Amino acid sequence: MRSEKHLLPLPLLLAICCLGTLHLSSGFPQSVPSYLEGLDIPESERHAFCFSQWTALQDQEQIPSFVMDLCSSIYNRMKVNEENNHEIYKRFLFQFSRAKDPSLKIGESQIATAEYTKRDSSGIVGRPFFLFRPRNGRKVSINEH
């Protein structure tokens, strides 16, 4: 006869893993979750603290080795993601912290302000002209008002 091996289905195995990661009353300090809730600590640092607590409990037989491997792999991935985010943030700051040339130089802006008011044929300064044409396409005449 063929020896029958009972393989656990994936959902049951996942449920066992989740139950294995619950805070156990023996060995895990119960005051840590309430201590962390009062502080303004980023989520990644909370996970890192919890993972460091789990790794401190390696000697206990209650925590299976696959749970420890899972915690270690998640912690390592988080560390890599944080390093990548830090590099992206540094590049972003470097790009926008460089001094940029002003779009209008001082001489050009003085010329632009001198030409802002429109003079009519008699040389009298009239009202300022519109920079854009009206939407209906009509031209603006000074004599309308």
UniProtKB/Swiss-Prot annotation:
| Modified residue annotations for Asparagine amide | N136
One cellular-component annotation, GO: extracellular region
Q: In which tissues is it expressed?
A: Expressed by the skin glands.
**Key word Signal present in the record?**
yes
Its domain of life?
Answer: Eukaryota
Alphabetic keyword roster: Amidation, Cleavage on pair of basic residues, Secreted, Signal
Q: Which residues form the propeptide?
A: 28-89, 92-117, 140-145
Q: Where in the cell is it found?
A: Secreted
Q: Does the keyword Cell membrane apply?
A: no
Q: Where are the transmembrane segments?
A: none
Residues in the signal sequence: 1-27
InterPro entries hit by this protein: Neuromedin-U_amidation-site (IPR018070), NmS (IPR043253)
Q: Where does it mainly reside?
A: secreted
Query: What additional remark is attached to this entry?
Result: Isoform 3 encodes peptide NmS-33, at positions 92 to 124, as a result of splicing out of an exon that encodes a processing site which generates NmS-17. Similar 33-mers and 36-mers have been isolated from human and from mouse and rat, respectively, although they do not arise by alternative splicing.
Q: What is the protein name for this chain? A: Neuromedin-S
Lineage, highest ranks first: Eukaryota, Metazoa, Chordata, Craniata, Vertebrata
